[in-house]
């Protein structure tokens, strides 16, 4: 019996809720998980099939981003995303959470790059959607359904990904702002929001630190010089360019005991929205992605005492358009699972959940509060 067959059998036979566990690097949502038994997937790893000429690779869900990068680099190829998390995050977690990748090569999202998945449903059925070639569209909607479902509809065990040729240059350029007053942010934010920068950028601030601008350069080396020149208008540009896979700032090293919030706003409201966010959380790590209008706040474990207050703060920040996506995080001894999800509301959602996980055994969330569940977003 294969590992996937054993996994399916366990799901069929369980009488207890299960929480899906990947590499132990991702933040899991909400907790406490009421009587949920861990369902580890880190043994499901390795390359299933790789055809470099087609720019397609199929890997087991427990394969890490670092392992994927090492395999594809040997053929001068790469997975185009650099999502939040660490290089030791698993591909299954990246797909299940549709992990944000704010400095993605070519501005891709997870859904753009997932061609197919193998999933074990809450019924214990092994199913496939999509395929291992770029033009295969069989079951495509089911691929999108499971991407970002946080494991609530099925356990992703295998993923087929679209790859890209590795560019000759792929680095991050960092600029530390000289000024951090309202006037400086007032000058900077409109330019970021209007997308006048020559390349994808982020505004990042470490706890009690000075805001920094991060820009990704992929392809033509001359573009790196253009980005440095652009950033010098705002601050001091680091002399050393950081390779994307060695990023040490906004993309990696989220604390293992933290609370994470994410909120979005329209471009027209971005300047007051981001300024208010930076003021509201002076002790948090904040990252603003102008391309997506998304503000991400990572708060230390001590902030758990003020969780409801911080949640209310993020609601007020997002009130300009009501797009609120809190991801509350509680790490259980370094192990991790999926982010919180709201209970199904529409008839369609109820029907899909019942069809794929009728017993509600996969990643069932024990509510923190009605407020959290009411605004959490799958």
Give the positions of each predicted feature.
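Short, conserved charged micro-motifs
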Residues: 66-68, 180-187, 221-229, 269-276, ...
């Amino acid at each position: 019996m294969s590992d996937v067959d054993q996994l399916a059998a366990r799901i069929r036979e369980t009488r207890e809720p299960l929480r899906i566990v990947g590499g132990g690097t991702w933040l899991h949502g909400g907790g406490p998980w009421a009587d949920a038994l861990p369902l580890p997937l880190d043994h499901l790893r390795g390359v299933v099939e790789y055809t470099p000429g087609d720019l397609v690779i199929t890997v087991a869900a427990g394969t890490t981003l670092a392992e994927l990068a090492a395999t594809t680099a040997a053929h001068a190829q790469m997975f185009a995303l650099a999502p939040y998390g660490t290089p030791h995050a698993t591909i299954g977690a990246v797909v299940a959470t549709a992990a944000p990748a704010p400095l993605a090569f070519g501005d891709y999202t997870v859904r753009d790059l997932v061609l197919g998945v193998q999933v074990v449903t809450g019924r214990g059925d092994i199913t496939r959607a999509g395929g291992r070639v770029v033009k295969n569209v069989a079951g495509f909607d089911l691929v999108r359904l499971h991407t970002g479902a946080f494991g609530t509809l099925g356990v992703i065990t295998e993923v087929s990904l679209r790859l890209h040729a590795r560019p000759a240059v792929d680095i991050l350029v960092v600029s530390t702002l000289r000024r951090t007053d309202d006037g400086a942010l007032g000058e900077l934010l409109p330019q970021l929001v209007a997308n006048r920068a020559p390349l994808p950028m982020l505004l990042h601030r470490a706890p009690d630190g000075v805001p920094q601008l991060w820009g990704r350069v992929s392809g033509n080396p001359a573009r790196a010089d253009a980005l440095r020149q652009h950033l010098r208008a705002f601050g001091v540009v680091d002399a050393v360019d950081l390779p994307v896979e060695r990023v040490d700032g906004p993309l990696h090293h989220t604390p293992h005991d933290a609370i994470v919030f994410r909120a979005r706003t329209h471009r027209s409201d971005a300047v007051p929205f981001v300024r208010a966010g930076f003021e509201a959380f002076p002790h948090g790590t904040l990252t603003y992605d102008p391309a997506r209008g998304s503000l991400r706040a990572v708060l230390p474990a001590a902030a758990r005492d003020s969780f409801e207050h911080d949640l209310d703060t993020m609601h007020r920040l997002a009130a300009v358009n009501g797009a609120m996506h809190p991801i509350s995080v509680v790490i259980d001894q370094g192990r991790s699972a999926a982010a919180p999800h709201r209970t199904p509301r529409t008839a369609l959602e109820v029907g899909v959940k019942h069809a794929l996980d009728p017993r509600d055994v996969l990643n069932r969330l024990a509510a923190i509060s009605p407020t959290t569940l009411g605004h959490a977003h799958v």
